[in-house]
Amino acid sequence: MLRGQEERKYSIRKYSIGVVSVLAATMFVVTSHEAQASEKIPTTNAAAQKETLNQPGEQGNAITSHQMQSGKQLDDMHKENGKSGTVTEGKDMLQSSKHQSTQNSKIIRTQNDNQVKQDSERQGSKQSHQNNATNKTERQNDQIQNTHHAERNGSQSTTSQSNDVDKSQPSIPAQKVIPNHDKAAPTSTTPPSNDKTAPKSTKEQDATTDKHPNQQDTHQPAHQIIDAKQDDNVHQSNQKPQVGDLSKHIDGQNSPEKPTDKNTDNKQLIKDALQAPKTRSTTNAAADAKKVRPLKANQVQPLNKYPVVFVHGFLGLVGDNAPALYPNYWGGNKYKVIEELRKQGYNVHQASVSAFGSNYDRAVELYYYIKGGRVDYGAAHAAKYGHERYGKTYKGIMPNWEPGKKVHLVGHSMGGQTIRLMEEFLRNGNKEEIAYHKAHGGEISPLFTGGHNNMVASITTLATPHNGSQAADKFGNTEAVRKIMFALNRFMGNKYSNIDLGLTQWGFKQLPNESYIDYIKRVSKSKIWTSDDNAAYDLTLNGSAKLNNMTSMNPNITYTTYTGVSSHTGPLGYENPDLGTFFLMDTTSRIIGHDAREEWRKNDGVVPVISSLHPSNQPFVNVTNDEPATRRGIWQVKPIIQGWDHVDFIGVDFLDFKRKGAELANFYTGIINDLLRVEATESKGTQLKAS
């Protein structure tokens, strides 16, 4: 019996040793993996890292398997002999277990010391692999830099920082190294740069487009940036354009004697518009549109200091002067610009001027729309062209309009030309009217006397034909089309019509006691049928060139232009309208697209791109959508908007489902924000002068 008890005690001791050994092995495996995790260092050599990580894992798995088998054998022995155990045997077992645990603890400490030593050796090996991989990556990057002639700043410091990571702290796994020809690849501890205000040259953009033709930047603003470089070199032609020869003027803008940048050349700008990917996103536009500041409940003072006056273009009818079925000019049904901006707390107005009148007549009407009073076209002008001197009477939105009290002017299409001419009259007057007044006496409108500076803060043009349009030369100003336009005016001038198309100064309004037959006979004798004092002529290349010669830049005004393009190059090299272009502009788009001069072909359906960028004889600079457009005395040319035709700027194409109201809201919000920056810049300048 004593022998049996001794055997059972021996079995129990063996079982205790096994249990403790299993626990020790488990602790060893956990400790080994923790040490391994803490010693991982970022490396660009994925193969070496994988090989290093697999070694301790395999050792741990082998140890665990061996200890599990030993534990299982001891467990089987315990099941056979453990049924007859006594309390005394249990006490002996506990004492033996304590003694054995002490011995096992010493063994574990010895094993851990050995493991730490092995891990240190592996760490040195991994560090060597990392240095070799890093050096190899640097040599590859140097080759890429030599190939693409691009500067990479900070790559050495980044590599050094990666090698000097504190080994006492767990490191973040290294990212896969991708060669970047524009800038150094960011490390895992530094987030990639998201700076969109840094300009790129056209050459860099073309290279990016070639490498990733289908890649789109979803973080870009609503308008596609064609020319994203801010050019500090002002472009000014020394020669004024010859009438009917604008192409020579544009080709000669950048003379070899002047410092120029191909990024600001009109031909290059249009070429970039062809190659640049379309990244306009209506989703992004909808998100940006939500940034519009709502009108506060107790707000009385508008958000903008100076009123914003929107001026429509050719064929435009607004407010009470628009027929029942005529679309809302500013925004259509997609986004009612005037109404929505007023809800946001902005002081905005839509001017109502002649839909068919000349820029001269429209400029005079615009002045009286703002100031108020009866329209005075001028005695000299009326005598020269043969229409009435006085027109309708405006109530005025700003009767106290005078120097120091300014307005912002935003013009679509022909409206941009009208704005420029009115500002010229305010500042420099009308020489013909001044001379006529001196010779004949009588009254003269304050508009024509000049000396009224500092009454306009900014001029913004949207798809304006500053240099004219071939569509007017070859279609709009033809005799047949003019007869149709004037016949429409004659019909709408009957006594029962409340619609004013803007030619009442020419007699296109039936008198109360006049029969319709007599009215037709009278109007048929009007000089308008053969006159150039109308919109059809002013939109031609010659008419626009004359306007450019009449106007100048005001150093106190911020000038900005927006341009769209909705055509593509066909197999024969001519421009064809894009799918989705407003159907009424298909013919005019093809007329422009088949011009003999290649740089004049790209268009928005009505206006060639080269004409909308800026007046050909005035200085300009290309700006991005990200930078504040607050410069004065120079045309700031915004990037060409891909896929926008002439009426997309005002949202009246009800058949175009690609252009959403949120996109239009974002566009006009951007304009308003620029105008607020102009006011802030002006206020800051005033404070600096006062101090």
Curated annotation (Swiss-Prot):
Reactions it catalyzes: a triacylglycerol + H2O = a diacylglycerol + a fatty acid + H(+)
Keyword Nucleotide-binding: no
One matching Pfam family: YSIRK_signal
Residues holding Ca(2+): G580, D645, D648, D653, D656
Residue numbers covered by the propeptide annotation in the UniProt entry: 38-296
GO molecular function, one term: metal ion binding
Organism superkingdom: Bacteria
Entry EC number(s): 3.1.1.3
InterPro entries according to UniProt: AB_hydrolase_fold, Lip-like_C, YSIRK_signal_dom
Region (Disordered): 34-267
Keywords on record: Calcium, Hydrolase, Lipid degradation, Lipid metabolism, Metal-binding, Secreted, Signal, Zymogen
Leader sequence residues: 1-37
Keyword Coiled coil: no
GO biological process: lipid catabolic process
Polar residues composition bias: residue spans: 41-72, 94-115, 125-135, 142-172, 186-196
Compositionally biased residues, Basic and acidic residues: 73-82, 197-214, 258-267
Name of the protein: Lipase 2
UniProt source species: Staphylococcus aureus (strain MRSA252)
